Amino acid sequence: MNRPERLQPGVKLRDADKVSRIPVKVVPSERDTMLRKPDWLRVKLPASNQRITEIKQALRKNGLHSVCEEASCPNLSECFNHGTATFMILGAICTRRCPFCDVAHGRPLKPDAEEPKKLAQTIKDMKLKYVVITSVDRDDLRDGGAQHFADCIREIRLLNPEIKIETLVPDFRGRIDKALDILAIEPPDVFNHNLETAPMHYRKARPGANYQWSLDLLKKFKERHPDIPTKSGLMMGLGESNEEIAQVLHDLRAHDVEMLTLGQYLQPSKFHLPVERYVSPAEFDELKDLAESIGFTHAACGPLVRSSYHADLQAQGKEVK
């Protein structure tokens, strides 16, 4: 059996090159076997792309990344047109290789020590009032990137004292207590960590992740910061049943998570995990009703919902679909 080639620093692996390195084989989808996308998932492009161009230029100017672009989010046009973006720190190369995700895999470069200041200035220039900061997984770092998150939060608040900051963090490779000790110095206004799918599908969809680690991360943060909302997101269409998702919702509530996002998985390319079903808006409404009935303070559930989609409105408890 041939060993995978040694990863070179800074080289992005995508699509077939990326998924070939995971333990579960993903067979490329043939066009005639792919499910037809229903009408409710058709995204209308805005008439003007000027605001989109401006935001992309602001990101490029300071060498920053948005998860909107790197993960091929279907809401990019809408969010950029409204002047919002989710910033992705610690580079654009992930040490994990989840076959549902379009972010590149590889051997990341050393974190940019100037990124926190560049990020803060960009946010000020864009006159943003609410930002989401996320990152790739950095299993190569002893703290999983926690210190870089804290540095970014500190610098953002120095230049933008009125801003609200939501962090969408990785699992820090199970180094939970160390990461939370660091984040306690500069906690966010909303703490988000996505479970992504039901535990039965972790080996297939999230190699390297651990369901209980993720739940423990959310619960331990809440124990330390009882007044800061905790949040998590899930995708549907990876082979899970509605009953499995319902159990995950109960698990989240048992770990004191208050906010939920639930959306449809969309296959980034034929080399990624296939969409096994398209969940109807009515089913999302049913799961939203369940979430609210078991105590979530806010649940954004719909085909195009993503964890940072209209995050400012989610944090205010407004309806998002």
From Swiss-Prot:
Co-factor(s): [4Fe-4S] cluster
Protein name in the entry: Lipoyl synthase
Species classification: Bacteria, Pseudomonadati, Pseudomonadota, Gammaproteobacteria, Alteromonadales
Record domain Radical SAM core: where: 80-297
Recorded GO MF terms: 4 iron, 4 sulfur cluster binding; lipoate synthase activity; metal ion binding
Reaction it catalyzes: [[Fe-S] cluster scaffold protein carrying a second [4Fe-4S](2+) cluster] + N(6)-octanoyl-L-lysyl-[protein] + 2 oxidized [2Fe-2S]-[ferredoxin] + 2 S-adenosyl-L-methionine + 4 H(+) = [[Fe-S] cluster scaffold protein] + N(6)-[(R)-dihydrolipoyl]-L-lysyl-[protein] + 4 Fe(3+) + 2 hydrogen sulfide + 2 5'-deoxyadenosine + 2 L-methionine + 2 reduced [2Fe-2S]-[ferredoxin]
Keywords: 4Fe-4S, Cytoplasm, Iron, Iron-sulfur, Metal-binding, S-adenosyl-L-methionine, Transferase
PROSITE patterns: RADICAL_SAM
Family: Belongs to the radical SAM superfamily. Lipoyl synthase family.
Cofactor comment text: Binds 2 [4Fe-4S] clusters per subunit. One cluster is coordinated with 3 cysteines and an exchangeable S-adenosyl-L-methionine.
Keyword Metal-binding carried by entry: yes
UniProt GO cellular component terms: cytoplasm
InterPro entries tied to this protein: Aldolase_TIM, Elp3/MiaA/NifB-like_rSAM, LIAS_N, Lipoyl_synth, rSAM
Pathway: Protein modification; protein lipoylation via endogenous pathway; protein N(6)-(lipoyl)lysine from octanoyl-[acyl-carrier-protein]: step 2/2
The encoding gene: lipA
Origin species: Shewanella piezotolerans (strain WP3 / JCM 13877)
Residues where [4Fe-4S] cluster 1 binds: C68, C73, C79, S308
E.C. code: 2.8.1.8
Annotated positions binding [4Fe-4S] cluster 2: C94, C98, C101
